[in-house]
């Protein structure tokens, strides 16, 4: 009887352990070892740096012009034109 109980407990332990390992691999491994995610994060970071540089250049040009916009919008439609 003791041998049957021990083997049954061992079998249940192995099943539970297997389920835990499969569950943890499904969640943790893609996050830890995904090179695609790292590449996407590096591209996003590079894009943010480029946008910051562009914005700083635009702000510098605008400050040099005294805060005036570079282009002037037209006054509107011509009254003589239909």
Swiss-Prot record:
Q: Which residues carry this modification: Hydroxyproline?
A: 74, 77
Signal peptide stretch: 1-26
The yes or no answer to whether the keyword Signal is present is: yes
What is a single cellular component term in the Gene Ontology annotation?
A: extracellular region
Q: Which residues are glycosylated?
A: 77
InterPro entries reported for this sequence: CLAVATA3-CLE (IPR039617)
Keyword annotations for this protein? Developmental protein, Differentiation, Glycoprotein, Hydroxylation, Secreted, Signal
User: Which BP terms from GO are recorded?
Assistant: cell differentiation
* Assigned protein family: Belongs to the CLV3/ESR signal peptide family.
Additional information: Roots of plants overexpressing CLE53 exhibit normal growth, but reduced levels of colonization by arbuscular mycorrhizal (AM) fungi. Roots of plants silencing CLE53 exhibit normal growth, but reduced levels of colonization by arbuscular mycorrhizal (AM) fungi.
- Name of this protein: CLAVATA3/ESR (CLE)-related protein 53
User: Which taxonomic lineage does the organism of this UniProt entry have?
Assistant: Eukaryota, Viridiplantae, Streptophyta, Embryophyta, Tracheophyta
Q: Which gene encodes it?
A: CLE53
């Amino acid at each position: 009887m003791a041998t049957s109980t021990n083997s049954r407990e061992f079998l249940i332990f192995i099943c539970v352990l297997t389920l835990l390992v499969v569950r943890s691999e499904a969640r943790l491994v893609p996050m830890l070892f995904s090179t695609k995610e790292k590449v996407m994060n590096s591209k996003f970071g590079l894009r943010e740096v480029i946008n910051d540089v562009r914005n700083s250049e635009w702000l510098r040009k605008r400050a040099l012009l005294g805060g005036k916009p570079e282009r002037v919008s037209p006054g509107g439609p011509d009254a003589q034109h239909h």
